[in-house]
């Protein structure tokens, strides 16, 4: 709440004749106020304004602006629109002036009204530099120095912030961000793309929902043609957080004053927050070294005497003091409106950073004994995750699949390969049987089953499965290796030597286990070349095949052996061999479909994981390598420190928001 003349008049009518100046030496006017009125106003101020301002100031002091946008007012306008003059009038200090681009870096102007102090204080800070200022006349020089340091001494601009803090009895409680004036064409030493760069910088600020756009427009131009208002409308089409400020009313052409009044009364280009009109120091007044306090007095007289604009003064829409009051009121309202969203953002950021910090773990201890315990914890966590993988109990996200589930899919594919291999087309199998009958039957009489034919076909069909089994071994091995590597990344990512060592162990053990697994798979298929099955098991399987054939014959769905009708004895021999093949296939497929996955699981999951766990524990035996293994990536420590600082800021911010009376 800015102490306006209206407020003072209500508190003490006798004081109404003494204007309260926001800039320059206002002490004389302040001393003339009655003590009762002053106490009353201070009480109102403390109750309504200070809690909101102090909350945001405290969050800003914590550095929360590094994490989240806080409510503020951004001042934008076309070049030479009078932005600097408005800011000077509000802050009471002279800011850089001149031709071309004067504001080359975003200037955060933090104004804090002192209630019980008379001393003026200022501070300029940028990058790692900070300087206290005790004389308002030094501000312009320090701002120019800051801009030259950040953006160079040419005409370029920078996104880097300069912060000017002013504490005084004569300023309103506001946070303003002064942005470079919009230019369309590069002139002189300006970069060719200066216009684009400035617009990009401005949009970065005004698109934030937490920012009120204060659009400065000269009164003597067509408001519809101003770039600044167009940019504000682009990011705030409803005009919910845009305020229009008309400047230079003394330069309005005669006969057009009523159009200016219509603009201020929101009848031309509608903004929900409306418009204000102010008259700041002109160029001649600046050259004549007119003080800011005197300029405010002249402004008041100008509007009081103006035949068109005096009504705007009576409506509270004219003069810098009224503007200051409106801006403070708007900022307070905006703060209160933004607090629920800000609270949610802080809570969500706090949770996100907490989770991110957990990935970086705690700092590596300096003490050697502590390093050993630290490394033990790291390796134990890794080994526990490997155990979870082996047992099929690892934690996965909603969209992820457990390793064992993926392995089961591969084993299911293997059973399909076996089934497809054994279930050849009956005509193809019949031709194969006839070939072996003609090739190997010898002197046996027709109708007798040739065991050599049966055995040869069985061996060939089983042999055909050997390479697919080895391929499955390689596929599963890659899946397990990648899963183990992911566990290493999860646990050791920030310790590149430890992660690299774990990857080396993973690869070495993989190669060894894969060789052993392949050796046993090939041994199994060598054993499968011995055609064997328990007698009672085989008899049972053969009986089932024959019963099934008999049932199908009854239903007139017997196998088609029409191509081999040379004799009933040949038919009988063919069918007999076919039945034996089907019976043996059933039993052999049971063995192979289960035994090969068991071999792969044993070597490439169980033993692989256990050997890896032992190898990682062996790292603890060499104490001289602890420091090397626990060496972090160059930015890990800095990142952890950065996250801790952010977390501390957000924790304090949550606490202060919780304590805010609301």
Curated annotation (Swiss-Prot):
Q: Where is this region: Bundle signaling element (BSE)?
A: 341-366
Q: How does it sit in the membrane?
A: Peripheral membrane protein
Mainly localized where?
A: cytoplasm
Q: Which domain of life is it from?
A: Eukaryota
Organism phylogeny: Eukaryota, Metazoa, Chordata, Craniata, Vertebrata
- Where are the annotated segments for G3 motif? 178-181
- The residues covered by the Dynamin-type G domain are 67-340
Where can this protein be found? Cytoplasm; Endoplasmic reticulum membrane; Cytoplasm, Perinuclear region
**Where is the segment annotated Middle domain?**
366-533
Q: Which UniProt keywords apply?
A: Acetylation, Antiviral defense, Cytoplasm, Endoplasmic reticulum, GTP-binding, Immunity, Innate immunity, Membrane, Nucleotide-binding, Ubl conjugation
In this chain, GTP is annotated as bound at 77-84, 178-182, 247-250
List this protein's GO terms for biological process.
defense response to virus; innate immune response; receptor internalization; synaptic vesicle budding from presynaptic endocytic zone membrane
Q: How is it modified after translation?
A: ISGylated.
The gene is MX1
- Kindly give the SMART domains that the UniProt entry links to this protein: DYNc, GED
Q: Any idea what this protein is called?
A: Interferon-induced GTP-binding protein Mx1
Q: Which family does it belong to?
A: Belongs to the TRAFAC class dynamin-like GTPase superfamily. Dynamin/Fzo/YdjA family.
Give the UniProt entry's GO cellular component terms: cytoplasm; endoplasmic reticulum membrane; microtubule; nucleus; perinuclear region of cytoplasm; plasma membrane; presynapse
- What task does this protein carry out? Interferon-induced dynamin-like GTPase with antiviral activity.
What are the boundaries of the region G2 motif? 102-104
Q: Which organism is it from?
A: Pongo abelii (Sumatran orangutan)
PTM N-acetylmethionine: list the residues.
Answer: 1
Q: Where is this region: G5 motif?
A: 279-282
Induction field: By type I and type III interferons.
């Amino acid at each position: 709440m800015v102490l306006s003349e209206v407020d003072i008049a209500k508190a003490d009518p006798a004081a109404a004749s003494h204007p309260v100046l926001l800039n320059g030496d206002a002490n004389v006017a302040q001393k003339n106020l009655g003590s009762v009125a002053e106490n009353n106003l201070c009480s109102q101020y403390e109750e309504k304004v200070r809690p909101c301002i102090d909350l945001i100031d405290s969050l800003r002091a914590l550095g929360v602006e590094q994490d989240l946008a806080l409510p503020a007012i951004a001042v934008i306008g076309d070049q030479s629109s009078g932005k600097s003059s408005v800011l000077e009038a509000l802050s009471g200090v002279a800011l850089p002036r001149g031709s071309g681009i004067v504001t080359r870096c975003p200037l955060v102007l933090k104004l804090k009204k002192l209630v019980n102090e008379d001393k003026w204080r200022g501070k300029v800070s940028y990058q790692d530099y900070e300087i206290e200022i005790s004389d308002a006349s030094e501000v312009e020089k320090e701002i120019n120095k800051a801009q030259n340091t950040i953006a160079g001494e040419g005409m370029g601009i920078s996104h880097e912030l300069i912060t000017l803090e002013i504490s005084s009895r004569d300023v309103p409680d506001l946070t303003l961000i002064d942005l470079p004036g919009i230019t369309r064409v590069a002139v002189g030493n300006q970069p060719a793309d200066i216009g684009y760069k400035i617009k990009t910088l401005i949009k970065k600020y005004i698109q934030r929902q937490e920012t009120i756009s204060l659009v400065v427009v000269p009164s003597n131009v067509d408001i519809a043609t101003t770039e600044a208002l167009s940019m504000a409308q682009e990011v705030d089409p409803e005009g919910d957080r845009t305020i229009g400020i008309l400047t230079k009313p003394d330069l309005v052409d005669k006969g057009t004053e009523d159009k200016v009044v219509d603009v201020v009364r929101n009848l031309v280009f509608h903004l929900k927050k409306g418009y204000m009109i102010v008259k700041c120091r002109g160029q001649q007044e600046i050259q004549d070294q007119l003080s800011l306090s005197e300029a405010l007095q002249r402004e008041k007289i100008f509007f009081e005497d103006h035949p068109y604009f005096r009504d705007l003064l009576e409506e509270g829409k004219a003069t810098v003091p009224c503007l200051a009051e409106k801006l403070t009121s708007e900022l307070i309202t905006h703060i209160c409106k933004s607090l629920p969203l800000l609270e949610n953002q802080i809570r969500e950021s706090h949770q996100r950073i907490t989770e991110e910090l957990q990935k970086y773990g705690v700092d590596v201890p300096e003490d050697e004994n502590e390093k050993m315990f630290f490394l033990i914890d790291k390796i134990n966590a890794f080994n526990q995750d490997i155990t979870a993988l082996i047992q099929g109990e690892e934690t996965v996200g909603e969209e992820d699949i457990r390793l064992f589930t993926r392995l089961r899919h591969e084993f299911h594919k293997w059973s399909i390969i076996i089934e497809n291999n054994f279930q050849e087309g009956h005509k193809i199998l019949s031709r194969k049987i006839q070939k072996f009958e003609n090739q190997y039957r010898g002197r046996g009489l027709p109708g007798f089953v040739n065991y050599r034919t049966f055995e040869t076909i069985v061996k060939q069909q089983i042999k055909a499965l050997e390479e697919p089994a080895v391929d499955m071994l390689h596929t599963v091995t890659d899946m397990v290796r990648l899963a183990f590597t992911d566990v290493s990344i999860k646990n050791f990512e920030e310790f590149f030597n430890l992660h690299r060592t774990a990857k080396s162990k993973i690869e070495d053990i993989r190669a060894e286990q894969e060789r052993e697994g392949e050796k046993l798979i090939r041994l199994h298929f060598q054993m499968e070349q011995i055609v064997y099955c328990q007698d009672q098991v085989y008899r049972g399987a053969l009986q089932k095949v024959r019963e099934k054939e008999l049932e199908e014959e009854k239903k007139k769905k017997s196998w088609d052996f029409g191509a081999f009708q040379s004799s009933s004895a040949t038919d009988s021999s063919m069918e007999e061999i076919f039945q034996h093949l089907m019976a043996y296939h059933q039993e052999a497929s049971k063995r192979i479909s289960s035994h090969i996955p068991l071999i792969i699981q044993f070597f490439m999951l169980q033993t692989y994981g256990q050997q890896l766990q032992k190898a990682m524990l062996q790292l603890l035996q060499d104490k001289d390598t602890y420091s090397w293994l626990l060496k972090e990536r160059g930015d890990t420590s800095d990142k952890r420190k950065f996250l801790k600082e952010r977390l501390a800021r957000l924790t304090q911010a949550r606490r202060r928001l919780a304590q805010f009376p609301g």
